[in-house]
């Protein structure tokens, strides 16, 4: 899959949000399907993937850090690395797949060891991705046959056995099925298996041996995933909240963000953690090439569309501040996610437009994109996305049209007349199409 230009230049938020790969019937709502290749896949915790075209989602951008390039980091000392020895080929699966056999603790351990050996000698990135998927299927089968606690106990045994880690040279990439699409190393893969068990055994191990002290962002992210699943995805878990905040406020990690760190922003959405919204606002002003502003913008857009207080926090945290042009566009896009059918949302919009720190260019941009109904659908480490129905989207567009018609007659908006008239024309076309289709 060809990476989007903006995924390697995440500061160009406006362009990224405008790139829709599918447009719904009637041309009145754009849905952006974004299934991988995020800019933050190029993480110091990952390394080169030999394949130019991996077979599954999560392909590596062409400028992915390689030895000698900025951002490349050698695997930690003592970590085995996958390679392509002379004559290497993927190790075949046994004649009877584990998913088709009755497992016990011993055979589960043997199957996991087989996959470990296969991952060490797999000839290419495609092979490693297939083996990672096979591991997930094995864990799911074992949970069904042995029970979650028994599987967790076996994985904990393996994690505590003092094994040599394996650097897979793959990115930290969630999948759409709740499992990881790819992980950077063997330890992360075992932790993903623990997360699938949602077992108290898994959570206890992680609290004492993973989240007890900072090691790597991949370790911490997977530890959070284990605790999140074991708690039943409990939003108000104080331990989880504290550990998430600890990760997002670790200066060593935030100054050199990895894919695992940026994917962990999604926990803020999943938990609807409004205490961390100010942190997300600060991340908007990070180095654009790091992917941090783009990731933070997505988090804030998703939260603001459901809760106007999030957008209000964004406005409050940036009131009176002249922002960089790209950050200003990001702020405008977040506010544009607000619902014009809600008076509470409209109050936030009024405060935003009255802010002296909002430049004429930013206000013009906001007026041209509001109401923002584009949706970026992503594979996420924790949260689930529920896009609006056609009817809900049409009602938002209709309310937006009424608002723009009122603004067109308001002398206070005289300087933005061009943007307002453009939006009136845009929304009139959309609303008329929805009426013809019987949606309104």
Regions from the language model: what does each represent?
Residues 258-261, 291-296:
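Alpha-solenoid helical repeat architecture
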Residues 33-285, 316, 379-440:
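Extended repeat-based scaffolds of very large eukaryotic assembly and lipid-transport proteins
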Residues 221-225, 294-297, 329-331:
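Alpha-solenoid helical repeat scaffolds
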Residues 301-381:
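Long alpha-helical repeat scaffolds
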Residues 213, 251, 287-288, 303, ...:
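Short coil/turn helix-boundary motifs
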Residues 1-10:
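Juxtamembrane low-complexity tails/linkers enriched in Ser/Thr-Pro and polybasic
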């Amino acid at each position: 899959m060809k990476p989007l230009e903006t995924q390697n230049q995440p500061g160009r938020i406006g362009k990224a949000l405008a790139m829709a790969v599918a447009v719904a019937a009637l041309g009145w709502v754009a849905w952006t399907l974004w299934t991988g290749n995020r800019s933050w896949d190029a993480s110091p915790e990952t390394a080169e993937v030999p394949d130019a075209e991996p077979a599954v989602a999560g392909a590596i951008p062409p400028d992915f850090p390689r030895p000698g390039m900025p951002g490349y980091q050698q695997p930690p000392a003592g970590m085995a690395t996958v390679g392509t020895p002379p004559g290497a080929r993927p190790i075949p699966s046994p004649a009877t797949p584990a998913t088709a056999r009755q497992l016990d603790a011993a055979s589960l351990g043997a199957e996991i060891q087989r996959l470990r050996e296969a991952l060490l000698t797999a000839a290419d990135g495609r092979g490693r991705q297939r083996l990672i998927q096979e591991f997930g299927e094995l864990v799911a089968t074992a949970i069904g046959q042995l029970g979650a606690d028994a599987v967790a106990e076996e994985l904990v045994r393996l994690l505590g056995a003092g094994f040599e880690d394996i650097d897979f040279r793959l990115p930290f990439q969630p999948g759409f099925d709740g499992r990881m699409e790819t992980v950077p190393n063997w330890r992360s893969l075992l932790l993903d298996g623990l997360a699938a068990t949602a077992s108290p055994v898994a959570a206890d191990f992680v609290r004492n041996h993973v989240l007890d002290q900072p090691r790597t962002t991949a370790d911490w992210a997977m530890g959070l995933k284990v605790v999140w699943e074991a708690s039943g995805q409990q939003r108000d878990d104080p331990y989880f909240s504290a550990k998430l905040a600890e990760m997002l406020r670790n200066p060593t990690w935030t100054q050199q963000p990895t894919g695992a760190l940026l994917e962990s922003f999604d926990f803020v959405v999943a938990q609807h953690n409004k205490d961390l919204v100010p942190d997300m606002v600060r991340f908007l002003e990070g180095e654009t090439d790091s992917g941090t502003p783009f990731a933070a913008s997505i988090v804030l857009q998703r939260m603001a569309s459901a809760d106007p207080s999030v957008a209000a926090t964004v406005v409050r945290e940036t009131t009176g501040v002249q922002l960089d042009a790209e950050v200003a566009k990001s702020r405008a896009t977040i506010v544009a996610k607000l619902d014009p059918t809600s008076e509470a949302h409209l109050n936030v919009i009024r405060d935003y437009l009255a802010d002296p720190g909002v430049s004429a260019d930013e206000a013009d941009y906001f007026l041209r994109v509001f109401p923002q109904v584009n949706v970026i659908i992503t594979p996420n480490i924790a949260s689930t996305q529920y896009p609006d129905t056609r009817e809900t989207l049409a009602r938002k567009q209709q309310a937006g049209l009424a608002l723009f018609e009122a603004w067109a007659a308001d002398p206070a908006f005289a300087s933005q007349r061009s943007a307002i008239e453009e939006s009136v024309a845009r929304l009139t076309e959309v609303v008329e199409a929805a009426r013809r289709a019987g949606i309104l």
